[in-house]
Amino acid sequence: MAHTLPPLPYALDALAPRISKETLEFHYGKHHQTYVTNLNNLIPGTEFENLSLEEIVKKSSGGVFNNAAQVWNHTFYWNSLSPNGGGEPSGALADAIKAKWGSVDAFKEAFNKSAAGNFGSGWTWLVKKADGTLDIVNTSNAATPLTTADKALLTCDVWEHAYYIDYRNARPKYLENFWALVNWEFAAKNFA
């Protein structure tokens, strides 16, 4: 089965000025598309040819895994953002964040510290553990919670291509602006 680039849940310029249209043109239109294209070139005639994206991520390794996981990770990232995002979580998710970190601000500080310290290229995730508690997890390269017992709630892409056009090498500045775009509704649905 051929995989396709999922549509963005908003217009290319909808996250500006925090994430520019130019960044999305490259990040979504080039990087994300390339992972889809590479995956489609790698799977014909293999055991992965007719599997869903999630099944491929869970069962593959090497180039197939890297491209499939990056398709999944990026799609999750786009949904973790919203032009109407920001603010604070509510309900059960807010309660779980406060139970773990004491406050939403303390959580954001811990997340930013983790993401800023995520060496090289990767992802920083808010995850729900098997016991129902929350945690912040860094993954490198294409690694994803999808291959673990953790349930991803939201993610921040800390590959340089996610922020270099807008913030150059200032990852902490990108992280500061990330919170104004966070889609807490998406995170809450994943938590439920």
From Swiss-Prot:
Record GO terms (molecular function): metal ion binding; superoxide dismutase activity
KW Oxidoreductase (keyword) present: yes
Amino-acid positions noted as binding Fe cation in the UniProt annotation, renumbered to this chain: H27, H74, D157, H161
Swiss-Prot/TrEMBL catalytic activity: 2 superoxide + 2 H(+) = H2O2 + O2
The entry's keywords: Iron, Metal-binding, Oxidoreductase
Cofactor: how bound: Binds 1 Fe cation per subunit.
Protein EC: 1.15.1.1
InterPro entries in UniProt: Mn/Fe_SOD, Mn/Fe_SOD_BS, Mn/Fe_SOD_C, Mn/Fe_SOD_N, Mn/Fe_SOD_N_sf, SOD_C_sf
Cofactor(s) named in the record: Fe cation
One Pfam family of this chain: Sod_Fe_C
Function text: Destroys superoxide anion radicals which are normally produced within the cells and which are toxic to biological systems.
The protein's assembly and partners: Homodimer.
PANTHER family: SUPEROXIDE DISMUTASE, SUPEROXIDE DISMUTASE [FE] 2, CHLOROPLASTIC
Protein family membership: Belongs to the iron/manganese superoxide dismutase family.
The protein, known as: Superoxide dismutase [Fe]
The gene coding this protein: sodB
